[in-house]
């Protein structure tokens, strides 16, 4: 009913103008019936006064004009009603066309989206085919590194078990070390001057500078031999043979 407003306005104008067009001034019956009379009147003479038409003629003319006006208005009303009824149909048709256009556009968009999705799937498959060998290489490298780490850990564990004391492994006793000159000097200080030298050496300021180094070395060796031979005898062991 969008076009009903202007149609109704047009209908009102037609209804108002129809009676004026139908009921307008009509020529008199006398002039229509006797046209010669007007031509016979001389210009100098005065025109005689028109006589009013009889009552029957006026009623007939009025009835004819009313019938024509009624027919005209009926035709206009019928036309307007037809247009008003046809208007909603046209609006519905236009809406259907718009809906069809929208549906066709949506279908085209769906088709384009499906094509784009198919292209992206193809690209992804291509990338996966390129990345598969890389993944395999990485997995193999990881496996080899893990195996190496496992073997290293196992070897470390075995070594720790072997090195632990009290597991049945005999630990070798430390051998008797040869005493140094410093240790011998400390023992002499602790033992005191009770022990006598086999060949005591008397030192003096004059002979200290003259004594050669080999004599000092021989004296130290004798002292060390004496301490070594006395040590095991005190503990009840056999003396070491040098």
Curated annotation (Swiss-Prot):
Keywords: Coiled coil, Membrane, Signal, Transmembrane, Transmembrane helix. Residues 27-62, 186-210 are annotated as: Disordered. Disulfide bonds: none annotated. Its main location: membrane. Residues 1-24 form the signal peptide. It is found in: Membrane. Residues 47-62 have a biased composition (Basic and acidic residues). The chain crosses the membrane at residues 65-85. One of its GO terms (cellular component) is membrane. It is a single-pass membrane protein. It comes from the Eukaryota. Residues 97-132 form a coiled coil. This is Coiled-coil domain-containing protein 107. The gene is Ccdc107.
């Amino acid at each position: 009913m969008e076009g009903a407003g202007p149609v109704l306005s047009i209908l009102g104008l037609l209804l108002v103008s129809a009676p004026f067009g139908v009921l307008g001034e009509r020529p008199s019956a006398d002039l229509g019936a006797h046209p010669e009379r007007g031509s016979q009147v001389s210009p100098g003479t005065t025109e005689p006064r028109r006589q009013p038409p009889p009552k029957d003629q006026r009623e007939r003319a009025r009835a004819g004009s009313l019938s024509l006006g009624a027919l005209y208005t009926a035709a206009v009303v019928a036309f307007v009603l037809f247009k008003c009824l046809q208007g909603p149909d046209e609006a519905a048709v236009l809406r259907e066309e718009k809906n069809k256009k929208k549906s066709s556009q949506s279908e085209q968009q769906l088709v384009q989206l499906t094509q784009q999705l198919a292209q992206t799937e193809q690209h992804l498959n291509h990338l996966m085919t390129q990345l598969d060998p890389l993944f395999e290489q990485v997995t193999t490298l990881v496996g080899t590194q893990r195996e190496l780490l496992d073997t290293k850990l196992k070897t470390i564990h075995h070594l720790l078990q072997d090195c632990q004391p009290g597991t049945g492994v005999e630990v070798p006793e430390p051998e008797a070390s040869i005493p140094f000159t410093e240790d011998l000097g400390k023992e002499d200080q602790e033992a005191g001057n009770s022990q006598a030298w086999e060949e005591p050496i008397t030192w003096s300021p004059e002979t200290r500078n003259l004594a050669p180094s080999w004599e000092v070395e021989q004296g130290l060796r004798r002292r060390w031999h004496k301490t070594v031979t006395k040590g095991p005898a005190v503990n009840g062991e056999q003396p070491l043979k040098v």
